[in-house]
Regions:
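N-terminal catalytic or cofactor-binding beta/alpha core of small enzyme domains
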Residues: 1-145, 150-252
Length: 252
């Protein structure tokens, strides 16, 4: 039995023909779990929590795509089925435990079950992004890859002070160019996560490997729970990213 119906797409493109050099990605956009997986054994309340998706990230990404005239790809399925920001061999790609929550539907998966999720979720999403970047490269279109994420204020009982995280691994060009972040908020590099946490998979595969500038952006989800907050933060991000995009365009 398929997880994803044959008439369903794993991904959604928004503003696919956008003119900006920035290509936006939101791989944790949705908490959707197909009926075939019976909610992975989780309650509706649990599926509304951060464990299932990045709260507010999709709204920020959609608003930002409009402000920048940038193409945006979103994942239409929950990261609990398969986390598209993890390599297939990574332990948290199909987590049995997320934060303090047990994920019954991910317990004791067979090799075939894991491969099915890789084939139906991971590969189509990454192939769609890869194809889009290939086409831009073939046209010599200046391109930078930016992914939009959110995180929780409280994690394992500890309060996080950071509001905006700029994440990078071996290439910090875009983080440096982004600057100090919006006034009145705490912006930090590689917080609350960093390369050591295995979170740079998508950026390394689609950004670093191509020599493209890239940046993973993390916003505390208590700032973007509402539509107003999502629009506000899209505006906060749009200014620095538009300047970076302008320089990329000038360098063509």
């Amino acid at each position: 039995m398929r997880i994803v119906n044959e008439n369903e797409q794993v991904f959604e493109w928004v503003n696919a023909k956008g003119k900006s050099p920035v290509v936006l990605v939101c791989e944790h956009a949705s908490n959707h779990i197909p009926a075939a997986l019976n909610g992975l054994g989780l309650s509706k309340a649990e599926l509304k929590r951060h464990i299932a998706y990045d709260i507010g990230a999709a709204g920020v990404a959609r608003a930002l795509a409009q402000l920048l005239d940038a193409p945006l790809i979103l994942n239409r399925f929950s990261r609990l089925i398969y986390d598209c920001n993890r390599a297939p061999e990574h332990a948290s790609a199909m987590p049995e435990v997320s934060e303090v929550f047990s994920i019954p539907g991910n317990k004791n998966l067979t090799a075939d079950q894991k491969q099915q999720r890789i084939d139906e979720i991971y590969r189509p999403f990454h192939r769609a992004l890869e194809d889009a970047l290939d086409k831009r490269a073939a046209r010599s279109t200046p391109t930078a890859v930016v992914s939009i994420h959110s995180f929780t204020r409280i994690y394992h009982g500890q309060r996080r002070k950071v509001d905006l995280g700029l994440l990078f691994d071996r290439d910090d060009r875009m983080a440096q160019a982004f600057g100090a972040g919006p006034e009145g908020f705490v912006t930090m590099s590689n917080e609350p996560y960093g390369p050591a946490n295995g979170v740079m998979h998508l950026m390394n595969v689609h950004g670093y490997a191509r020599g493209m500038q890239h940046l993973m952006i993390e916003i505390c989800n208590d700032l973007i729970e509402s539509q107003a907050g999502q629009i506000e933060w899209a505006k906060h991000l749009a200014g620095p990213l538009a300047k970076i995009a302008e320089k990329l365009g000038d360098a063509k």
